[in-house]
Regions:
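Extended amphipathic alpha-helical segments enriched in small hydrophobics
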Residues: 1-25
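C-terminal regions of mature proteins
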Residues: 19, 27-105
Length: 105
């Protein structure tokens, strides 16, 4: 059903505007940070996934501190930094909208 497509797109743009105007609330950042750290840990919990991660590092030309820096970045990012990144990289004028499903009239 397409009735939610336009409201959904508008809500995405509203969230982008909000990120431009105000820093992410600390409670929300903490929730996302915990989720990301948990996902990072889960992706390295088996010998095979850890081997895959090291293969990724080797084939991408990254150094052996890549994982440590990633964890540090997630732990240390501030609401102000996220706002600055949103202002720099989330430009509504350059976004492309892709909609899957029934053709809109």
């Amino acid at each position: 059903d397409n009735e939610y497509v336009e409201p959904l797109i508008q809500e995405v743009y509203n969230e982008i505007d909000k990120l431009h105007r105000e820093p992410v609330p600390m409670e929300e950042l903490t929730m996302v940070r915990n989720y990301m750290l948990g996902e990072m840990c889960r992706s390295y919990e088996s010998p095979f996934s850890l081997a895959d991660a090291w293969i990724f590092i080797a084939t991408s030309g990254l150094d052996d501190q890549y994982f440590s820096r990633s964890l540090q970045a997630v732990n240390e990012v501030t609401p102000q930094e996220i706002q600055e990144l949103a202002q720099r990289y989330l430009c509504k004028e350059t976004l492309k909208e892709v909609i899957a499903g029934k053709k809109l009239s």
